[in-house]
């Protein structure tokens, strides 16, 4: 027997159906090994603390509910001991959606690759840290793919009100549609915002004023894509005049011909009443066709401050079925990562006369828009007639 037994190494046992799940969990929940990047969906969505139950046919349907707020009015004057006048009650708005399944590109290791790693293990005197690090890098790539997928869907939902998944090489099509009221889809003012002469700030304030008349005094924020903010808003004539006026009144230097920076804009915008804080949206993903973005290019969003919704998730059907009915000749180890949203599966199976070792990452999750009655989508490319 070899002095250093590769089959008893940490790396080899990651595929063991008995010890593998525990070892995988230790690795996948270690922040020094698996990195958590500040992706788009994490900035705008939380994770539903409840797992959506799965029906007998494998379908997991979630319900997004929002209780509509009652408007506050001035109090009624009454005679002593007089009763109150009952107010009209508002109901609960809701919509449903089905949680889809996703899988990242898999890693397949064949016998010659495993043999090379065993020799590397022996040459390093039984130290498999380098081999485990390579495995972690492979899993990290899959986690990044899952994060990008959630971000793409989240950006679509926030800027379009629906998710139509066209990425990857698998199933394509519509996933869900939030029940955003028709009156929440608005256009630009007299001119499209791309026109330097457009009164962008005036239009933003007007949209907010109309929203507050409908919704009441709730804290709002603007979500504007990076390119629109820098290529449209910062080059707008009304914005330039506001910045120049602000800097002149506050005795701040103005360089002729110098463009407006984000810092200059944020200093000056406080002098323009009626516009909520602006959050710049940045999100891009890599797909088989190149770089893509889920956010609709010419859309700005006005919505309540805070998270836009939750990531709805359910259990992976693969784990349940394989643990109950899986072939005994195939070994599998499952573990969670990504705050429980993603499932890593290591599989050992036969391929002809040799074994193969597979690593896959799966996800049954989708973002839901949970402030949809108060979510306003502005098409800045279309002017009002």
Show the residue positions of the predicted features.
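Long, contiguous amphipathic alpha-helices that act as assembly "spine/axial" helices in icosahedral shell
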Residues: 100-181, 199, 203-204, 208-228, ...
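Assembly/oligomerization interface modules of large self-assembling protein complexes
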Residues: 37-121
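N-terminal alpha-helical "arm" segments
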Residues: 1-54, 58, 368-385
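A structural signal for short, well-ordered beta-strand segments and their strand-loop junctions
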Residues: 53-58, 221-225, 280
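Intrinsically disordered, low-complexity coil segments
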Residues: 49-62, 86, 90, 124-125, ...
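Charged, long alpha-helical assembly modules
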Residues: 189-255
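Charged, low-complexity intrinsically disordered segments
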Residues: 177, 182-194
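Sequence/fold signature of self-assembling virion shell proteins
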Residues: 238-385
